[in-house]
Amino acid sequence: MKNKFFYKKQFTNIYKKQSKLSETTSQVLYGEKFEILSKNINWLKIKTSFDNYIGYIENKNYSKSHLVTHKVFVLRANIFDNFKKKTKNYLPFASKISVMEVKGNFIKFEKNKWIKKTDIKKINHIEKDYLKILKI
């Protein structure tokens, strides 16, 4: 079962075994691509595209399509609902998003989910100022 999928929540742990009590070995971030190696009702065995890491995640919060246009370029990009009210949620550095709409200083990346325009860069952006990277 070799398919490409994208994770659609903030992030989740990758476990060594099919249990939340198992050792956490890595994480999958919002918009990160992965391949499903096997699946059952509650768990997916995956291989991440970024670093080829293999492990288990819960069988939820993923989709087959995701047109990535930008990446989060701050440690934590706060998520706002209706681009006015800050929520407790955030997207971590390197999360990959699709810009759906732009309003003022905010971009919409999902229904009722907005982040500040200054928190993202185009997906193909390469930072040449290494001091700027170290400040992140």
Regions found by a protein language model. Name each.
Residues M1-S19, Q27-Y30, L37-N40, K47-F50, ...:
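SH3-family beta-barrel domains
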Residues I120-K122:
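Long hydrophobic alpha-helices with heptad-repeat/coiled-coil character
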Residues I136:
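Second-shell loop/turn segments in exported
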